[in-house]
A protein has these predicted regions:
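Carbohydrate transferase catalytic cores enriched for Leloir-type hexosyltransferases
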Residues: 1-382
Length: 382
């Protein structure tokens, strides 16, 4: 079978959805069933496609650069022309929307619905485009994949998609053999290395992730701990814009908060392996992958107490209430300096991490694609 894939997220600097798709392709490279198919990877002609690892070379992959722009015009006009030319049996769209005139069954992944649940976090053009295209794409798809039960409930509630059309396939903690895939793990999956006195955040910078609260809570702890620093890695996509350097300066820690928009995987995994604590104060996520990645590297995470966080991290996280700087500072201090508190979380990590693997994710995703191709009227159920 020939499987078309919208591979735009593998161009440029892959983050988020790009790492999701890269990890699935890498895992498919180890699966005999996956090697029976041919994969047509579509991307804008102007952008270089970056395949994730040598493992994906075990797959029959055909690159399909498509000219004629980017974003919605490319997706809705140029991509359908290429699909009609190549005629794959099914299209996998891993990033929220798909061509409405694809001319074939579509498997669509919707990771979260923040732009519907909280439109105030997006500019009017971006939220309108996302909401319209995602809703129409979901209703036209043969199968909708998502990453948590929480996100499934949001898709059903906010987009009016029938629940039996939506399948939950979680992500996993560490990308499958992406170059620089991290230091060796100790038994149980937790990496061992001497920790350094810094707090780490990794992820795109959105308002919902409340970096302003993290900086201010960090400042409370840092007043009496001059050795502490806060490392923030993520592209600033806040709306309305939040000036994090100014917030840090106002809190008195401007010289102790280091912000980088992007780091290569080798640097990222080095940061994970050295950090003492990971903090991710997001009030809305579909899954929330980076705290799991931190946990896999032996870093206890602090997260907001939300339904999806409880679903994903279970007992292997420290939970704090939204907006409570004192409680957040207490959690930071406890996990930075109390070894028993750190161990209480890390001892729970193997059971939580054992729920997830990119092999499981890739296998379930391929099954959904194959079944949707065979039964295009509705795809898989469950």
């Amino acid at each position: 079978m020939r499987i078309g894939i919208d591979a735009r997220e593998l161009t440029g600097r892959p983050t988020g959805v790009g790492r999701y798709l890269a990890s699935i392709l890498a895992a498919w490279g180890d699966m005999p069933d996956a090697k029976a198919h041919t994969y047509l990877l579509y991307h804008p002609q102007e952008d270089q496609l970056d395949l994730p690892s040598p493992d994906s070379g075990a797959l029959a992959i055909a690159r399909r650069p498509v000219g004629g722009g980017r974003r919605s015009w490319w997706e809705q006009v140029r991509l359908p022309i290429a699909l009609r030319r190549d005629r794959p049996e099914v299209l996998f769209a891993p990033a929220y929307s798909a061509p409405l005139m694809a001319g074939m069954p579509v498997v669509l992944t919707i990771h979260d619905l923040s732009f519907v649940a909280h439109p105030e976090w997006f500019g009017w053009r971006e939220r309108t485009r996302r909401r319209w295209l995602t809703a129409l794409s979901a209703r036209a798809a043969g199968c909708v994949l998502t990453v948590s039960q929480f996100s499934k409930s949001e898709i059903v509630r906010l987009l009016a998609v029938p629940p039996d059309l939506v399948r939950v396939i979680p992500q996993a903690a560490v990308p499958s053999r992406i170059p620089g895939g991290g230091p060796p793990a100790a038994p149980g999956g937790i990496t061992t290395r001497r920790r350094e006195p810094f707090v780490l955040y990794v992820g795109s910078i959105f308002n919902r992730r409340r970096l302003r609260d993290l900086i201010r809570a960090f400042a409370i702890v840092a007043r009496t701990r001059p050795e502490l620093t806060l490392e923030i890695v993520g592209d600033d996509r806040s709306h309305p814009h939040e000036d994090l350097p100014a917030i840090a300066a106002a809190a008195g820690v401007g010289d102790r908060v280091n912000i980088r928009a992007y780091v290569p995987d080798e640097t990222l995994y080095d940061l994970y392996s050295r950090a003492a604590v990971f903090a991710f104060l997001s009030q809305y996520e579909g899954f929330g992958l980076t705290p799991l990645e931190a946990l896999a590297h032996g870093v206890p995470p602090i997260v907001l107490d939300t339904d999806v966080a409880r679903e994903v991290y279970g007992d292997a996280a420290s939970y704090v209430p939204m907006g409570d700087l004192d409680r957040t500072a207490d959690a930071l201090s406890r996990l930075l300096f109390d070894e028993a508190a750190r161990r209480a979380i890390l001892d729970k990590a193997p059971a939580v991490l054992g729920r997830y693997s990119w092999q499981k994710t890739a296998r379930a995703t391929l099954a959904a694609i194959e079944e949707t191709a065979r039964h295009p009227a509705g795809g898989p159920r469950g």
